[in-house]
Amino acid sequence: MAKKKAFIPFFYFLSIVFLPWLISLCCNKSLKTWITNWWNTRQCETFLNDIQEKSFLEKFIQLEELFQLDEMIKEYPETNLQQFRLGIHKETIQFIKIHNEYNIHTILHFSTNLISFVILSGYSFWGKEKLFILNSWVQEFLYNLSDTIKAFSILLLTDLCIGFHSPHGWELMIGYIYKDFGFAHYEQILSGLVSTFPVILDTIFKYWIFRYLNRVSPSLVVIYHAIND
């Protein structure tokens, strides 16, 4: 009975790890049809907002200019002019489909992540006791480690997260989060986050070493600086 109670927090931790993935999988399947139908019905009333309409018209004008250039070079007869109009029509439909798919994808992923966050927050709130036991286990495990292993682990973690080679990893991670939420890839925003986020983490970490580790374990700080140097 004691062993069973001891493993409850561990299973609770596993459920927290895998719960968002299960929620995302279920919500994607259940919400996709509903969001697609809702978006297609809504599109009958309003097609584009001002920004989307401007972007769409720019692409359409570029396409039309290419067709007109091709027409001037080849000196299209009347039959080919009909093909030109048909090509414009097909490309317009294709632009609309791409636009609709992008918006459906964005709404679906944002809704799924929002639902996952709400459910996971409630799940964590109702399991405070299990989280408290799990936190005690982690603290006991870390306390039993030697200062050398602690310093090595801290140094390894900081080099992975805020080392000179970390920007590529942050770029992949932030890009994955953008994709998971269904947002478009914006190079300027991505570059700004990659260049500032590791610096903020580095500052927080140094402050933590100065305020917490110096008070709790001065020997660990000495070993950390010795390894780092």
Curated annotation (Swiss-Prot):
MF terms in GO: potassium:proton antiporter activity
Record's bilayer topology term: Multi-pass membrane protein
Biological process terms in GO annotation: potassium ion transmembrane transport; regulation of intracellular pH
Ranges that cross the membrane: 6-26, 107-127, 189-209
Disulfide bonds: none
InterPro entries on file: CemA (IPR004282)
GO cellular component, one term: chloroplast inner membrane
PANTHER family per UniProt: CHLOROPLAST ENVELOPE MEMBRANE PROTEIN, CHLOROPLAST ENVELOPE MEMBRANE PROTEIN-RELATED
Encoding gene per record: cemA
Protein name: Potassium/proton antiporter CemA
Compartments where located: Plastid, Chloroplast inner membrane
Family per record: Belongs to the CemA family.
Reactions it catalyzes: K(+)(in) + H(+)(out) = K(+)(out) + H(+)(in)
Purpose of the protein: Contributes to K(+)/H(+) antiport activity by supporting proton efflux to control proton extrusion and homeostasis in chloroplasts in a light-dependent manner to modulate photosynthesis. Prevents excessive induction of non-photochemical quenching (NPQ) under continuous-light conditions. Indirectly promotes efficient inorganic carbon uptake into chloroplasts.
Keywords: Antiport, Chloroplast, Hydrogen ion transport, Ion transport, Membrane, Plastid, Plastid inner membrane, Potassium, Potassium transport, Transmembrane, Transmembrane helix, Transport
